[in-house]
Each structure stands twice: as structure tokens, then as C-alpha cells.
Amino acid sequence: MPYQAESMTSQPQMTVTSYTVSHWSSDVCDCCDDCGIRLCGAFIPCILGCKVAQDNGDSCCLPFLPGAMVALRTSIRDRYHINGSVCDDWVIMTCCSFCGLCQLAREQKARG
């Protein structure tokens, strides 16, 4: 008995996933909002970077790779559906990495 493939009688439908775009819970320059995060970011930023990466489900070695903090910020922005672009992420993590890292840590803390 030869194999007969089932024929399709209708086209697959496109599914649209909608979500609400949100905003950062704190501004980039709000470093004084959380004293613990600010001190950790100022004196041991590598530890804060590792914590942010691990809380995002990434390797703790991620912050030590060139350009990885931009990707980490983009990943967190995508996870929480925060409005912005990769260019915004690059500018913040390149020009003001301390403030950007502290903002990421505050965002994770605020969203649990």
C-alpha cells in the first residue's frame, strides 16, 4: 500500500502576538535611587554586571565580552517590552556604562 500524503485544504493563518510597550521604571541618571546598586556599580561593577547577567538567565562571564553589555541591555529591554532601540542601548552602554548598568539592575529589581 503506497504512502499517501494528506492534502491541505486551508492555508495556515498568521498569528499576531500583541503586548503592551512599557518604559524603564527609572531614568538612566537615577543612580541615587538605590544606594546599594549605586555603590556596587561604582566600586565593583564587574560583580554587578555578573549579577545582572545571571538574573537575565545568561552566563556570569557575559559582561567580560566586548560589546556584550549592549546585547544584555537589548535583551532586558526585549524581555520587559521596553520602548527603545539597539542604537539607544549602544549609546547608553558606551557613553555612560556605569549609569546604564545601574539602570539595568534597578529594572530587574523593580520587575522581580
From Swiss-Prot:
<comment type="similarity">
    <text>Belongs to the cornifelin family.</text>
</comment>
<dbReference type="InterPro" id="IPR006461">
    <property type="entry name" value="PLAC_motif_containing"/>
</dbReference>
<protein>
    <recommendedName>
        <fullName>Cornifelin homolog</fullName>
    </recommendedName>
</protein>
<dbReference type="Pfam" id="PF04749">
    <property type="entry name" value="PLAC8"/>
</dbReference>
<dbReference type="GO" id="GO:0001533">
    <property type="term" value="C:cornified envelope"/>
</dbReference>
